[in-house]
Each structure stands twice: as structure tokens, then as C-alpha cells.
Amino acid sequence: MAILDGQTAFILGASAGIAQASARLLAADGARLFLLGRSSKRLDATRDRILEHVPGAEIHLHKGDPEDEATVKESAQAAFDVAGRLDIVVGTVATGGTGPLVHQDLATFTDHVMGNLRSNFLALRYGAPLMTDGGSIVFVSSTSAKIPMEGLGHYSAGKAALEMLIKVAASELGPKGIRVNAVRPGLTEAATTQGYIHLEELTSSFLERVPLGRLGVSDDIAPAIRYLAGPESSWMTGQSFAVDGGNEVRGAPRGPMFTV
């Protein structure tokens, strides 16, 4: 019997990247999946890719906005209703973008900060009450929550706020047997980094700050999410750890690397 057999995992923003890779690993260990995303086409592609690797996996799809309160509430309940339980919630929704803080207007700054909080808060708010037998909530933070990087002020502010939300939630929900943790990816090829990750000047300078000498990919991050979701991390809560090739050891590149 697989270690997650019988468990239900609700994954928000599940149509690509880190979420898709994490869903695949959860399914491989026996979890049934309930995937929420904005695009039916991309959700279908995610399902097909998972089934290529895990034939027979139980996968339920729900098209909707993972930043919309009614949608997340409805989806969390639907995930629970599949088998009368909700064991794992994975929140991956984020908003990228770059630019100096003094060039941001209030609306843009607010959108970027809340784009890294809104869906994750909703996942917590409506997922946790359905975890009646305890469970694990895992979020995707960022090394930007710990390392000041010029040009990522709005993004960093949102991720830093997420880190404190995780700590408070872990304290509040621990007595109910619900753990809340996060991974902090370094610079990773993902939807939120497509605007700049292939710029040679930026990546070459950034890689000087990465001891392992390469950018991340989704398959680097997913095993950490799988670990935090499963029983192997049963005595961990309120934590966040870096999967970053060692970037946090050396810190940010000098100068305005993310002002493109």
C-alpha cells in the first residue's frame, strides 16, 4: 500500500510548473487529487501528464479562479466531498513582476503583494476546517522572503507576509493536528519568472550567487513539497526551508538585477 493511499490532496494553481510536478509525486504515492486552475486546457494537460506517469491515478479537475473566495470555498468542499476527507492542501498561486519600488503605483504594489497572499489565505481559510482528522498545508514561498533583491520589493513583501501567515497558522492549527509549512524556491523556471529568467545578463550574474551553478526547475521543488505533505514530516510545522542551489548562502547579486 502506498504511503498516501486514501488521502485527498487539494492543489490550487495546479495547471503547470511546481504544482503539476508536486501533484504527480502525490499521486505516485497514492493520493487522490483535486486540482483547481484557471484553464481547462491546461488542467486537462496536467491530468494527462500525471496519468502517463501514474496510470490509474484518481484525479478530479475544477476550472476556476484560485484567487476568488467563492471558488476556493466551493472547491475545497468539493475536494472533501469526493471521499469525505481532506488531508493535504498545496497552495502555489503567486504573482511575479519586477521594477523598483519607487516606480510602482499603489494599485500595482497592492496587486503584487496580494497576488502572493490572496489564494494562499483562502486555501488556509477554507481548507483547514475540512481537515477533520488533521493534515498538512504546504505553501510555495520564495528565497525573496529572506534575501533583499532590488527590483523584487513588491514580490518579496508578499512572500515575507506569507511566511508570517504560515507561522501564525501553524500555532493556531497545531492543536487540531494540522501542520502548516512552506518551501522557499530559489530562481526557478516557472510562470512567474518567464519575463526575465532567460535574460543572459541577469541569469549569469545570478548564478554567481548559486553554489550549485544552475537555475531550478519544478522537479527540484516538488520533492520538498511532497515531503512536507506526507507523514515523514509529521513533527514539522511553522517552518519554511530553501530549495535554491545554495543561493541563500551567498545572498543576492549586487545591483538592480530585477529592474527589467
What are the residue ranges of the model-derived segments?
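Alpha-helical segment proximal to the catalytic Tyr-Lys
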Residues: P129-L130, S171-E172, S234
